Amino acid sequence: MKTDYTDISFANNGKLKLLIIVGTRPEIIRLSEVIKKCRLYFDCILAHTGQNYDYNLNGIFFRDLKLDDAEVYMDAVGADLGETVGNIIAASYKLMTSLKPDALLILGDTNSCLSAISAKRLHIPIFHMEAGNRCKDECLPEETNRRIVDIISDVNLAYSEHARRYLAECGLPKERTYVTGSPMAEVLRANLTEIKASDVLTRLKLEAGKYILLSAHREENIDTEENFTSLFTAVNKLAEKYNMPVLYSCHPRSRKRLEESGFKLDNRVIQHEPLGFHDYNKLQMSAFLVVSDSGTLPEESSFYISEGSPFPAVCIRTSTERPEALDKGDFILAGIDEKSLLQAADTAVMLKKNGDFGLPTPAYMDENVSDKVVRIIQGYTGVVNKMVWRK
């Protein structure tokens, strides 16, 4: 763990000094256009906790999304979860003490977001994107992180009115809660030319509309024996029923779990290292069926419906923190048990065949989220200092 940050400093160019902390692939993706805009208007430093340290889960996305490397790498991953969380808090505290930023921006519900605890102790205004998301499932570690970070953040930036209501139910100040919408449409629009130009189908010898795309990495799906067995039994049956390749974008932890379990996958199931942003989205656009536990699935489905490239989207979870996408019929919440998953897959395929695609989710369609975030940070840093910290 890195604890000495005396080699890092802001430019001190008279602009607001903003620290952005990330640690995982979803944060990098969602924040990519926001980071670019913040670098344009603020004195900005990007710090990476190291939570995802594999290149295919991290570095490849900096390249694809045309992001400059992070100025700070905390190397906070420990021997176990407790050590990692402790390191994130300790390292971020040292970093903030050294840098003395005017504000902190974080997104989501990862362990890296717990760096907000350090900012709170140091009276640094905290801006939290993706605030108010709730799936109401206390078994998920992300749900705990959401509650912690929402409560201690000074300004919460929600994706939807659903999320704003959840924040209000927690008693959080309405005057410091804003609905910005999801940043994903802006990210997808900025990368759409590269996505469409990807030659990933040729490289992987796949034919559009004749393969199933699978992404499964969540703790509840991989680490729970019953769910793991049910999920991959269903995957084998999908490969058999439709007699087509199932391309599995397989995280290192998931691959290790499969190897240790000895579970035999159908020979049509192809394990592949995690794909880059452009390649994965091209695969989604062109798939016969997408089966995923990714948090970005509802937003990507909504965007491609609006673009005229809908794909059958099945979410392998029992709960969702994105009810607004269910409101518009953008995906099917399938559950994890074998029977439900197979039925959901069949239904999704038939819906597309019949031209029933759902509707774009309004909360996911704004393409100026980065502008909103810049304005709110600039306007409310001083407000928080005055109203909360009495500076």
What are these regions (language model features)?
Residues 106-107, 113-116, 128-129, 156, ...:
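A donor-sugar binding/catalytic signature common to diverse glycosyltransferases
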Residues 51, 59-61, 196-286, 391:
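Donor-nucleotide binding loops and adjacent catalytic segments primarily
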Residues 2-7, 51-56, 75, 152-225, ...:
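A nucleotide-sugar donor-handling region in carbohydrate enzymes
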Residues 16-22, 27-34, 41, 61, ...:
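Active-site and donor-binding regions of nucleotide-sugar-utilizing enzymes
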Residues 74-75, 158, 179, 270-274, ...:
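Short acidic-hydrophobic, aromatic-tinged amphipathic segments that line or gate anion-handling sites
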Residues 13-14, 95-102, 206-207, 286, ...:
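Glycine-rich phosphate-binding loop signature in dinucleotide/nucleotide-binding domains
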Residues 350-391:
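C-terminal amphipathic helix plus adjacent low-complexity
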